[in-house]
């Protein structure tokens, strides 16, 4: 069956049930807007398992998501959504582009979590947007932006508590949202592809920065993370 959409890390397929899609997690790893690419055996299986566990965690905390269930080691069933073309980034610690933009040392704690919005457009390099830009682009209303902000901070609270129990700091993460019948829900994935996660004591990176910065084996790192949070693949 032909994918109705194929991105850098996942492919989406129709199912026989209206409003339900099948997500296939690929082994492709990319960084720097696709400039660095590699196929890493087993990556998709690990991301599927981790995302499944974290979406189930969101459900337990009453956060609405598109996730229905995991159906194989690489696949999930999800609700079909109309994606909002914004990436919602929540940051607790200065790292990556924020550290570079502010001239801060990576690892500097923020006084409070901040929420940033980026335009989902690969051709433009997913630029950082202000709320004025969002209004000009007409991709979300002021009310929707506030909903995205509050949902992002809610997810942050849940992740901070969960990973904190496993000795892991949540540095920052990227979320995507969509609409179902006008209601905004969490979509895409939550995985070490989309989060920065550091060991609390050693500051070891447990995320895609291992691939970005050639710090070691991505599958070993993701497998270690999955084991630490008590998850398992199918």
From Swiss-Prot:
InterPro entries cross-referenced by the UniProt entry: SAICAR_synt/ADE2_N (IPR028923), SAICAR_synt_PurC (IPR033934), SAICAR_synth (IPR001636), SAICAR_synthetase (IPR050089), SAICAR_synthetase_CS (IPR018236)
Pfam family, one: SAICAR_synt
Sample GO molecular function, one term: ATP binding
PROSITE patterns: SAICAR_SYNTHETASE_1
UniProt keyword DNA damage present: no
UniProt-listed Enzyme Commission number(s): 6.3.2.6
Pathway: Purine metabolism; IMP biosynthesis via de novo pathway; 5-amino-1-(5-phospho-D-ribosyl)imidazole-4-carboxamide from 5-amino-1-(5-phospho-D-ribosyl)imidazole-4-carboxylate: step 1/2
Entry similarity comment: Belongs to the SAICAR synthetase family.
Protein name: Phosphoribosylaminoimidazole-succinocarboxamide synthase
């Amino acid at each position: 069956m032909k994918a109705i959409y194929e991105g850098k890390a996942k492919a989406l397929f129709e199912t026989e049930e209206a409003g339900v899609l099948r997500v296939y997690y690929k082994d492709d790893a990319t960084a720097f807007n696709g400039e660095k690419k590699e196929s890493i055996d087993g990556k998709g299986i690990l991301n599927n398992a981790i995302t499944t566990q974290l979406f189930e965690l969101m459900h337990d905390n009453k956060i609405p998501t598109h996730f229905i269930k995991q159906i194989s080691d690489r696949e999930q069933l999800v609700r079909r959504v109309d994606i909002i073309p914004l990436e919602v980034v929540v940051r607790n610690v200065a790292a990556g582009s924020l550290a570079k933009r502010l001239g801060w040392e990576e690892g500097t704690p923020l006084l409070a979590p901040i929420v940033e919005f980026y335009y989902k457009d690969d051709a433009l390099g997913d630029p950082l947007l202000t709320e004025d830009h969002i209004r000009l682009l007409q991709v979300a209303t002021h009310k929707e932006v506030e909903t995205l902000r509050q949902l992002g901070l809610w997810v942050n609270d849940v992740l901070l508590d969960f990973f904190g129990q496993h000795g892991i700091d949540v540095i920052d993460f990227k979320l995507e949202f969509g609409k179902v019948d006008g209601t905004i829900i969490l979509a895409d994935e939550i995985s070490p592809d989309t989060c920065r996660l550091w060991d609390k004591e050693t500051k070891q990176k447990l995320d895609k920065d291992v691939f970005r910065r050639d710090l070691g084996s991505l599958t070993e790192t993701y497998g270690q993370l999955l084991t630490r949070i008590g998850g398992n693949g199918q």
